[in-house]
Amino acid sequence: MRQLIIILLSTNLSLELASSEFLEKKSTIPEAKKVFIVSSYVDKNLIKVSWEIKDGFYLYLNSVQVKKNANIIPYTVIYSDQSTYSDEFFGTTKILRKDFKISINNSDLLDLSNILIKYQGCSDSGFCYPMQTKKLL
């Protein structure tokens, strides 16, 4: 009888530990779309795109691209909170924090559905997201 009680208590304890957060490894890395929030709108002949970059994260300036089909479309930086960063993989590079805003001339781009925005960023803790691709509209 004593052995049965020990077995039942051990089983119960094992089940408790297995279901507790102690053994569960939950990801603490948020999705890219939650830390690099992209929005866009059309204002006359300009397309304006902005990123809200959450605290503790940054974008690589040189990763930001606007493309239509395979062609890179030039853009103008309206606002950026840039700084120089020494990256172990990319060397000295410009990064963006907080807000980043660009404008794209819309005079020749009538079909906005084919425009893609590409960007890549990392967390201050060292996790880097793969290149992100988002349709403009």
Describe every region a protein language model picked out:
Residues I6-L8:
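Sec-dependent N-terminal signal peptides
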Residues R2-L4, L13-L137:
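Extracellular/lumen-exposed scaffold segments
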